A protein has these predicted regions:
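Catalytic cores of secreted/periplasmic lytic hydrolases that degrade extracellular macromolecules
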Residues: 18-142
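Bacterial Sec-dependent N-terminal signal peptides
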Residues: 1-24
Length: 142
């Protein structure tokens, strides 16, 4: 009886440990760097900036929002979004966020989002290797 209880407790501990593991920054970068580089080539958004935003917005890929929506950048629905969405508590309860089938869809939409918004247009005049100017520019643009 004691052996069965011990084995059960060990099994529960192992299962809990496996499911409770979180993604590190390094793991996030390794997992998504190829998509970010591809998007940099396609759109001009620096891969370092894209990855940094993804890390911050998703807590390295561990946030509830990214797990239920593949939304790596916290992009909300707004009035023009007609695709799938999820409800998530953010600045206000039950806000509408875009939902993606894959992380790659989220990365592509992020690049397109920046390229098509007038208040981000000045960023594309910057050197794509100048991550500091891009970071300050994104902060300035809001």
């Amino acid at each position: 009886m004691k052996v069965k209880l011990f084995v059960s407790i060990i099994g529960l501990f192992v299962c809990t440990s496996v499911f409770a593991q979180t993604i590190t920054i390094e793991e996030y970068v390794n997992r998504y760097k190829d998509i970010a580089i591809s998007e940099m080539i396609r759109s001009g958004v620096p891969a370092s900036i894209t990855l940094a935003q993804g890390i911050v917005e998703t807590e390295n890929g561990n946030s509830k929002l990214v797990k239920k929506s593949n939304n790596h950048f916290g992009i909300k629905c707004k009035e023009t979004w007609t695709g799938p969405s999820v409800s998530h508590d953010d600045d206000a309860p039950g806000e509408c966020f875009r939902k993606y089938n894959t992380a790659e869809e989220s990365y592509i939409d992020h690049s397109d989002f920046l390229r098509t918004r007038k208040h981000y247009a000045f960023l594309f005049q910057l050197d794509p290797t100048d991550y500091k100017s891009w970071a300050y520019g994104l902060k300035k643009a809001g």
